[in-house]
Amino acid sequence: MTAMTVPPSLLPLEPFPTAPDTRASTPHIRLHGLGKRYPGGVQALREIDLEIRRGEVFGIIGRSGAGKSSLIRTLNRLERPSEGQVLIDDEDIGGYDGQRLVALRRRIGMIFQHFNLMSAKTVRQNIALPLRVAGVPRARIEERVAGLLQLVGLEEKRDAYPAQLSGGQKQRVGIARALVHQPQILLCDEATSALDPESTQAILALLRDINRRLGLTIVLITHEMAVIREICDRVVVLECGRIVEQGEVWEVFGDPRHAVTRSLLGSLRAALPADLQARLRQAPGAGDPVLLDLQYTGASRRVPDLLAIARAIGQRVDLLHGGIERIQGRALGRLLLQVGAPPGELPGVLAKAALVADKVEVLGHVAHA
């Protein structure tokens, strides 16, 4: 596999001030005691403390009204916090105004759910617009736009108009336009919510590619756990303006602690099938096997081994249902096993099952069909 290179036209228009010796070990973005209150007393954010590492893809998820949009919009000062601090490269941006605020927003690109393209301008003209407004020389604009069209895969659509593009192509234009000033941070506000599943996967793959090739820090908000699973390194869960859970994606998916997280994960986790649920009893009938839930949270890096499970339990074992997926190199999921063990032997069966899974739970007994 050949190494990918960044087109020369994607080099910065002008260098950003950096201090590698002091910034290398600090978070790229840090929020301390952040709060946001709107007129009428609506408290959108409460006591948010958060660190986002340089170069990571960081996800913010929550239900509608949880405070996701308010949070992401404080990062480029589209919203001014009511309390607390937003620090970029360890510098508080709360006092920025005028030219300092303009410079900040050029360092922080943003894409939205709705593409906000100018219908009377071509793809090339839409991408070039921020550079024209900034007074960048024409030749430099053409070079820069050509590199961005190559990056997002729209070279052949350079002279097309938005009405001639698919939703995924429109979002690619939005991404290219957000990158014109060579930002260090890219904010994504529900960037795939208006797309079909195929276009969603393509846009997420493009964002991950951009993250790796350009070293951008990407912060995205979504209400879809599948998006978090696909692209993010770490995630926070918001509810009523507060962080209720956070961690590496595999940690949050493998062992969700908060009810909101479990609810958001509901459609992605292997649920108990209805026919099996109908046969489940808490008190065993004569000869009814026990139903065990073997859970794999990723904490031990254990990989489910069906033969090892059968040998460890040492009883008649039937796999009735389950699902395992890999997230960040770890196996996560659950296996539902029907085990033909007499009640007196159940403690020993559970002890053995605990040797081959991260968590074991007795769900009940399966009545004979």
Swiss-Prot record:
The membrane topology term of the UniProt record is: Peripheral membrane protein
- Top-level EC class as recorded in UniProt: translocase
Q: Which CDD domains match?
A: ABC_MetN_methionine_transporter
Residues that bind ATP: G62, R63, S64, G65, A66, G67, K68, S69
Key words, A-Z: Amino-acid transport, ATP-binding, Cell inner membrane, Cell membrane, Membrane, Nucleotide-binding, Translocase, Transport
Q: Name one GO molecular function term.
A: ATP hydrolysis activity
Note one Pfam family from the annotation. Answer: NIL
Q: List the disulfide bonds.
A: none
> Which InterPro entries does the record associate with it?
AAA+_ATPase, ABC_transporter-like_ATP-bd, ABC_transporter-like_CS, ACT-like_dom_sf, MetN_ABC, MetN_ABC_transporter-like, NIL_domain, P-loop_NTPase
The keyword Transport is assigned to this record = yes
Which cellular component terms (GO) are annotated to the entry? plasma membrane
Concerning PANTHER family, the annotation shows: AMINO ACID IMPORT ATP-BINDING PROTEIN (PTHR43166), METHIONINE IMPORT ATP-BINDING PROTEIN METN (PTHR43166:SF30)
Family per record: Belongs to the ABC transporter superfamily. Methionine importer (TC 3.A.1.24) family.
| Subunit structure as annotated in this protein's UniProt entry | The complex is composed of two ATP-binding proteins (MetN), two transmembrane proteins (MetI) and a solute-binding protein (MetQ).
What is the annotated role of this protein in its UniProt record? Answer: Part of the ABC transporter complex MetNIQ involved in methionine import. Responsible for energy coupling to the transport system.
What is the protein's name according to its record?
A: Methionine import ATP-binding protein MetN 1
Q: Which organism is it from?
A: Pseudomonas aeruginosa (strain ATCC 15692 / DSM 22644 / CIP 104116 / JCM 14847 / LMG 12228 / 1C / PRS 101 / PAO1)
Question: Taxonomically, what lineage is the organism?
Answer: Bacteria, Pseudomonadati, Pseudomonadota, Gammaproteobacteria, Pseudomonadales
Gene symbol of the encoding locus: metN1
